[in-house]
């Protein structure tokens, strides 16, 4: 029934739009925090970190949680979406990013690093794709996170089995283009899904490099914890296969309050104004 409703483009849903989002950072404060991250980067304390801010609004009384999910779902074509409705909290995820897939004892991870907004003009859009592919800054971000994830899955994979299958490949969605890499490995004997998640959470693409220090910087500068955002949503089968996303582009509804985080990776040649705009483009 939900599948059929996802295909409906009903006027009722289109009319029930949720607006008036308020960030927990002003633009100036967001930029100042990026400048502080740049100080850490320039001192060699970190090489990259993922910095985000949170938008909050009150849910309109005439909107059900399902309507909110469907309304956004009409506007996205992301492959790793999820709708989780519990008694006290609802999670509507429109993630384009696979975190971990396990099939036949093979581990697959596909980090996203590098984003540019799409254009409805085809010629201009081709130029934007070219700009993204040739961006040294975005490629540097992608390469660093590939190294982080290679290291993470090497802890639970057979020696010599970890391979980069795709490096900084363009993947296009309705509103943005991304640079996506894919790393694979063969799991060691006596390793299960929980071991894999323990070795890889939180995802390298939403923390930074080196991972632990990047997480400390995030904890210092972000005003609130991320909740499910940037964690993992997925399933584990009886055969021990699994598939998890990283819940970016994710709406959380709690006590009739809607929140959505957005941000991006910061490296030494990041431009604070551009980073702020990229975070907005992802909403």
Region roles according to the model:
Residues 1-6, 10-283:
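Extended alpha-helical targeting/anchoring segments
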């Amino acid at each position: 029934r939900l599948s059929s409703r996802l295909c409906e483009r009903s006027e009722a849903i289109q009319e029930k739009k949720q607006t008036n989002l308020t960030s927990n950072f002003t633009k100036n404060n967001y930029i100042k925090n990026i400048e502080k991250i740049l100080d850490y980067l320039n001192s060699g304390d970190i090489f990259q970190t993922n910095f985000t801010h949170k938008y909050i609004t009150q849910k309109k009384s005439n909107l059900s949680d399902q309507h909110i999910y469907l309304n956004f779902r009409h506007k996205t074509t992301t492959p790793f979406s999820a709708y989780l409705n519990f008694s006290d909290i609802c999670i509507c995820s429109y993630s384009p990013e696979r975190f971990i897939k396990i099939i036949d004892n093979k581990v697959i991870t596909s980090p996203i690093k590098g984003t540019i907004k799409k254009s409805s003009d085809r010629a201009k859009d081709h130029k934007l794709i070219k700009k993204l592919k040739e961006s040294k800054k975005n490629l540097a971000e992608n390469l660093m996170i590939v190294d982080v994830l290679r290291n993470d899955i090497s802890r639970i994979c057979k020696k010599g089995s970890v391979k980069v299958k795709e490096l900084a490949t363009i993947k296009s969605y309705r509103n943005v283009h991304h640079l996506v890499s894919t790393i694979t490995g063969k799991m060691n004997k006596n390793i299960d899904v929980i071991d894999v998640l323990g070795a890889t959470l939180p995802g390298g693409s939403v923390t930074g490099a080196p991972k632990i220090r990047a997480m400390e910087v995030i904890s210092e500068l972000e005003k609130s914890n991320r909740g499910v955002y940037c964690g993992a949503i997925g399933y584990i089968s009886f055969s021990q296969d699994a598939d998890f996303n990283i819940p970016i582009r994710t709406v959380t509804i709690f006590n009739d309050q809607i929140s959505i985080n957005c941000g991006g990776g910061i490296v030494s040649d990041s431009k604070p104004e551009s980073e702020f705009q990229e975070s907005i483009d992802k909403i």
